Amino acid sequence: MKPDIKICGLKTPEAIDRALKRGATHIGFIFFEKSPRYIEPDLAAKLAEPARGKAKIVAVVVDPTNDELDEIVSLLKPDILQLHGNESPEHVLTIKALYGLPVMKVFSVRTAADLKRVEAYIGIADRFLFDAKAPKGSELPGGNGISFDWSLLSWLDGSIDYMLSGGLNKDNVANALANTTARGIDVSSGVESAPGVKSVAMIDEFFDAVEGADAPVMASGS
C-alpha cells in the first residue's frame, strides 16, 4: 500500500507541477504569517487550480480567527483544514460544523507526554499529523527540519489514521515508513534549498526515496 504524500508550504507553480507529476496526494499551503512558507490566500487559490481533482488541497492554519478561516475557505476552497495550533476538541468540532470540511489535527511531539492529548481528539479529528516539537526559541510550530523519536508512536496499532512529519527527507523517509504505521508522510523543509524555497530536484529525490523504500508501509511500530 503506497503512502499518501503531502508536499507542504508550496509557493510556486513549478514546485506544484513537479509534486503533481510525481504523484503527490496532498498539497499544502501555509497561512501562518511568521513562516517563510506563508502565502496570501488569493495567490494560493490561483496556484491550487491545476491540482483540483488530482490532489487534496490542504489549508494549514495556526489558531486561526473565524475571519481568517472565512477568507481562506472562501478563496482557496480547500479539501482539508490542517489545524497546527492549540485548538481544543470543542473548537475542532465547531470548525468542522462551520465549514463542512475534514480536519487534520497536528500534534507536536518531543516526549511521550506530548501524546497524552491525542485520545481526546479520536473520533473528532478526521486524521492526525505528528510533527516534531519546535526547538526552544522558534516561532514556527512546524517546518523546522527536525525529527522526533518515532518509537513514541509504537502504541498506534494502525487503527488510527495519521500522517508523519518532522524533518523527513530523502535520507530518512524509508526508515520512517518502515518503523511506523503512518499511512501518509508530510514533507516541507526536506525538499527545500533554503527556508521556503522548494527545489524541484529535491522533490524528485524525495519521491525516488519513497518509491525505493523496501519496507511495507503498514509495518508495525517499533
From Swiss-Prot:
GO terms for biological process: L-tryptophan biosynthetic process. SUPFAM superfamilies: Ribulose-phoshate binding barrel. Its EC number is 5.3.1.24. GO terms for molecular function: phosphoribosylanthranilate isomerase activity. It catalyses: N-(5-phospho-beta-D-ribosyl)anthranilate = 1-(2-carboxyphenylamino)-1-deoxy-D-ribulose 5-phosphate. This is N-(5'-phosphoribosyl)anthranilate isomerase. It comes from the Bacteria. The lineage of its organism: Bacteria, Pseudomonadati, Pseudomonadota, Alphaproteobacteria, Hyphomicrobiales. CDD domains: PRAI (cd00405). Pathway: Amino-acid biosynthesis; L-tryptophan biosynthesis; L-tryptophan from chorismate: step 3/5. It is an enzyme of class 5 (isomerase). The gene is trpF. InterPro entries: Aldolase_TIM (IPR013785), PRAI_dom (IPR001240), RibuloseP-bd_barrel (IPR011060), TrpF_fam (IPR044643). Belongs to the TrpF family. Keywords: Amino-acid biosynthesis, Aromatic amino acid biosynthesis, Isomerase, Tryptophan biosynthesis. Disulfide bonds: none annotated. Gene3D superfamilies: Aldolase class I (3.20.20.70).
